[in-house]
A protein has these predicted regions:
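Conserved N-terminal phosphate-binding loop of PLP-dependent enzymes in the Aspartate aminotransferase
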Residues: 1-394
């Protein structure tokens, strides 16, 4: 294991200043049995460096935004140039128009878009819009999927809620949690039954078109198409949370790859190039109901921040270069193949779920289609794998 003396010292100080010593639960690394986590000070390309001078090959990429790697020259240059002209104005800027135009052109469902500062904000705003436009209260989501930490989403959620083993939704009033119906991912029959039991009450169905927060779980053939058909029939607003998949699995996101167009889409991570940007958008008749054009309110002091927008634009323009997604597919396929080969050599049960450059190794036998399948994976083996990789500088 690498020398982490300075990381240990700083983490002990952090524990007295911040809950769990971190500003986001997944950074604590408690679920993988590692304390302290390395405190990082620098990144370049595929590598990151900690305060103790250790170097690691990084497969996290700031949890998704850094698809070009750390300190990508074109992104750094765009940020520096924009920051030199001002960090923010509290007024609209040309970059916001450029980013909105690029997003609308790229993502099939987007006719209009609103920039915000995080994926959480995008999802909570899209839900408010769906409820306001439909006049209905209830939400359908899926077990193990994570849509940020807004109250309505913290029911059978994924991401840190899942890995930290947090039960239910403490701090969320029962009356709010009761409006969220959480169903098994990939179970279209369960969705139809929930709609039947609550006629005229479901405002929206929100789904990660490729689940990423319980590990990567792909939609079964017909699942997304079935959701689209059902929502159309029942006048329910279908929301794709593409915070992870947007511009990761394909230029237009998972909806472009699968050919299924939702009513609203939530974006984040990659569209900010490593800085805080989120977005939600979709049908013009829905988005036109947002203030100031309509009565449904949402606002943000730093929404469309020029420096963050510049980072996002630079990242997306780089992704437009020919061959980018083919290269990501090639690298993802190679990594999945090598993981499977290594597991076979050690006689380990391993299922690798992958789409493009998104992948998860589950230490289990058989397919992983939902949260219950994911929970059957051997967590202790994953901890050993994680710790061994870190010791090897990965």
């Amino acid at each position: 294991m690498a020398n982490l003396v300075e990381s240990q010292r700083l983490f002990q100080t952090a524990l007295s200043l911040m809950p769990g010593g971190v500003n986001s639960p997944v950074r604590g690394w408690g679920a993988v049995g590692l304390t302290p986590p390395p405190l990082l000070v620098r990144g370049a390309g595929a590598r990151v460096y900690d305060v103790d001078g250790n170097s690691y090959v990084d497969f996290i990429g700031s949890w998704g935004p850094l698809i070009l790697g750390h300190a990508a020259p074109e992104v750094v240059a765009a940020v520096q140039e924009t920051a030199a002209r001002g960090l923010g104005f509290g007024a609209s800027t040309p970059g916001e128009v450029d980013l909105a135009k690029l997003l609308v052109e790229a993502v099939p469902s987007l006719e209009m878009v609103r920039l915000v500062t995080s994926g959480t904000e995008a999802c909570m705003s899209a839900l408010r819009l769906a409820r306001g436009a439909s006049g209905r209260p209830r939400l359908i989501k899926f077990d193990g999927c994570y849509h940020g930490h807004a109250d309505s989403f913290l029911v059978s959620a994924g991401s840190g809620v899942l890995t930290q083993g947090i039960p239910g939704s403490p701090g969320v009033p029962h009356e709010i949690a009761a409006l969220t119906l959480s169903l098994p991912y990939n179970d279209l029959k369960a969705v139809k039954e929930a709609v039947r039991r609550h006629p005229g009450e479901i405002a929206a169905v929100i789904v990660e078109p490729v689940a990423g927060n319980m590990g990567v779980v792909l939609p079964k053939p017909g699942f997304l198409e079935g959701l689209r058909q059902l929502c159309h029939q029942e006048d329910i607003i279908l929301i794709f949370d593409e915070v992870i998949t947007g511009f990761r699995v394909a230029w237009g996101g998972a909806q472009a790859l699968y050919g299924v167009t939702p009513d609203l889409t939530c974006l984040g991570k990659i569209i900010g190039g490593g800085l805080p940007v989120g977005a939600y958008g979709g049908r013009r008749d829905l988005m036109s109901q947002m203030a100031p054009a309509g009565p449904i309110y949402q606002a943000g002091t730093l929404s469309g921040n020029p420096v963050a927008v510049a980072a996002g634009l630079a990242t997306l323009k780089a992704l437009q270069k020919p061959g980018t997604y083919e290269q990501l597919e090639e690298k993802g396929a190679w990594l999945a193949q090598e993981l499977a080969r290594a597991a076979a050599r050690q006689h380990l049960d391993l299922t690798v779920n992958r789409l493009g450059s998104l992948l998860t190794p589950f230490f289990t036998r058989g397919p992983v289609h939902d949260l219950e399948d994911a929970r059957r994976a051997d967590l202790q083996k994953f901890r050993q794998f994680f710790q061994g990789m870190l010791a090897a500088g990965i």
